[in-house]
Amino acid sequence: MKLTIHEVAQVVGAKNDVSIFDDAQLENAEFDSRLIAAGDLFVPLKGARDGHDFIETAFENGAAVTLSEKEVANHPYILVDDVLTAFQQLAAYYLEKTTVDVFAVTGSNGKTTTKDMLAHLLSTTYKTYKTQGNYNNEIGLPYTVLHMPEGTEKLVLEMGQDHLGDIHVLSELARPKTAIVTLVGEAHLAFFKDRSEIAKGKMQIADGMSSNSLLLAPADPIVEDYLPADKKVVRFGQGADLEITDLVERKDSLTFKANFLEQELDLPVTGKYNATNAMIASYVALQEGVSEEQIRQAFRDLELTRNRTEWKKATNGADILSDVYNANPTAMKLILETFSAIPANEGGKKIAVLADMKELGDQSIQLHNQMILSLSPDVLDTVIFYGEDIAELAQLASQMFPIGHVYYFKKAEDQDQFEDLVKQVKESLGVNDQILLKGSNSMNLAKLVESLENEDK
């Protein structure tokens, strides 16, 4: 971040006279006082704790100046009405100043993987930066912008939403050149009236785009009412502008063809939904001048954010398909389809561990129960359920599967049977087996994966 104190003050409309402070060059912007280094701008946000309480600590660690909603004694400060708004204004200004091309990605599923893929492809030709981790909200996005390396040419930003209007704010800030909506599912349904309102929120990614900018959206009727008339809209899916024409799935890789590619692409990841993500990323990369051969080569060394669908090994030799970062009905259905399509190991069985999907609101139990349509005793030997809202699904499965092949462990305020879950999984898992783990991050299945990978845990 190459900005000066006086420049920042002008951008955010400082309410105090900053001319009395040296116009120092600022190195970075941080909202965690512990991460402040010499020459940084401190951004004291209000959350569970008020960042203003740590202004003194920030200066002890080397801060050059702080934003603040109140006067600060003995230190350079920029007085504003709202620190978060000022933080966002600063990021928007920095994007305009650097003239970097912005690519925005959202979706109920696939946004992080698509972001990773697109950034990876663009990096073959351009200096590229992307959202780190899950910094995809009203705080994380401006943080990403202000932390992009000097000389960045392409910036790939992930945009998340918890409430209607969240993505509108992010799009107006980022002003994307190209935007992608990967899929409209039921994620965060607790905060929306229905799936249509989720679609409305996702499609607001186009709100900050100029006319004739490129928007990629799924061939899903749910988005029809929200397609912008003044943008170049490209749809993807069966029978759409972009579609997969051939797909071969393997245990830890896949190969696919698309109607706009001359040759097939190989991916070192599993899941047909990842073929769709790769297709989208490839199309955008081609529009930016990346060659098909560069795309093909780049996918061979693709690395995705940890805990997005990945194969691991249990200490006993069994194969673990870990997908424990997050969960919603669409994502659970897709991973069950993928797991079912992969051939079983010789002499081994298939086991699924399914945990609660969070933030589904009043429809939670009903949406959990619908997963019964994705469970088949012809494919899965054993299904182990963990949670509270998933309890009825466990009962439905017990009526479909043979006795002794369905287990349920409770996780509620009054009782958590996690240790019993771990014990049962280890007893059920054979050396040649494959096991799928899927659930919301808060269900802590990542800890179960670690326990299977490390016998002493």
Regions found by a protein language model. Give the residues of each.
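Buried hydrophobic packing segments
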Residues: 87, 118, 122, 144-145, ...
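Phosphate-binding loop of NTP-binding sites
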Residues: 6-12, 87-215, 219, 223-232, ...
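Short gly/ser/thr-rich secondary-structure transition/capping motifs
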Residues: 20-29, 85-88, 136-139, 159-164, ...
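ATP-dependent carboxylate-amine ligase
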Residues: 1-15, 41, 129, 191, ...
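Acidic, Mg2+-coordinating active-site environments of NTP-dependent enzymes
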Residues: 68-72, 180-319, 348, 373-376, ...
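N-terminal leader/targeting and accessory segments in enzymes
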Residues: 1-89, 373, 378, 382-391, ...
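Short beta-strands and strand-loop turn motifs
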Residues: 14, 69-70, 100-103, 180-186, ...
